[in-house]
């Protein structure tokens, strides 16, 4: 029931309401023809107002075709594109890798600084012992090199010379 009433309501909106002929005044057939002509004028005016201009029609067609083309391209290239989840996973793994690399660099920097401090301390310690040895050696009477207890002297290391000789062979033809 509601669908028929909706159809009647739609048709009533589209059509101009008919005028009733007063009793006995005019010809019913002439009045009906006049009403049909007026109704056609009303419908033509309605269509003219609702119809898009040629420019608007062409523009809307171009937009719809572009959307359709973009959809086809997206479908065709979908297997080569990464989804949002894939991109998030890639970004997350990249961030984790950068974080680990940064931690490793920090660790290496701290260890390098500690190593340099220890190296300086050992060099300072070695320098102080070598300075005292030199002082003790040069400070002895008669210029002799006598050893004093508790002072280490550097022992000369044997020098090794290695020479490589080429064997001269002549190839006979």
UniProtKB/Swiss-Prot annotation:
Pfam families: FAM192A_Fyv6_N
Entry keywords, A to Z: Acetylation, Chromosome, Nucleus, Telomere
Compartment annotation: Nucleus; Chromosome, Telomere
Keyword Metal-binding assigned: no
N-acetylserine: modified positions: 2
GO cellular component: chromosome, telomeric region; nucleus
Any one Gene Ontology BP term: double-strand break repair via nonhomologous end joining
Classification via InterPro entries: FAM192A/Fyv6_N
The keyword Membrane is annotated on this UniProt entry: no
Comment field (misc): Present with 468 molecules/cell in log phase SD medium.
Protein family: Belongs to the FYV6 family.
Function of the protein: Involved in telomere length regulation and required for survival upon exposure to K1 killer toxin. Promotes fully efficient non-homologous end-joining (NHEJ) by a mechanism activated in postdiauxic/stationary phase.
Protein name listed in UniProt: Protein FYV6
Organism this protein belongs to: Saccharomyces cerevisiae (strain ATCC 204508 / S288c)
The encoding gene: FYV6
């Amino acid at each position: 029931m509601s669908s028929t009433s909706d159809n009647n309501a739609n048709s009533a909106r589209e059509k101009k309401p008919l005028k009733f002929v007063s009793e006995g005044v005019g010809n019913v057939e002439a009045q009906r023809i006049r009403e049909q002509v007026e109704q056609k004028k009303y419908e033509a005016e309605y269509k003219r107002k609702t119809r898009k201009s040629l420019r608007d029609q062409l523009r809307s067609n171009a937009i719809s075709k572009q959307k359709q083309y973009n959809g086809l391209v997206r479908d065709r290239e979908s297997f080569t594109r990464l989804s949002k989840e894939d991109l998030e996973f890639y970004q997350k793994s990249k961030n984790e890798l950068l974080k680990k690399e940064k931690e490793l660099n920090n660790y290496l920097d701290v260890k390098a600084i500690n190593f340099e401090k220890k190296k300086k301390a050992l060099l300072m310690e070695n320098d102080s012992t070598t300075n005292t040895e030199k002082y003790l050696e040069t400070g002895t009477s008669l210029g002799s090199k006598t050893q004093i207890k508790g002072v280490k002297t550097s022992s000369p290391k044997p020098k090794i010379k290695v020479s490589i000789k080429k064997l001269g062979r002549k190839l006979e033809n």
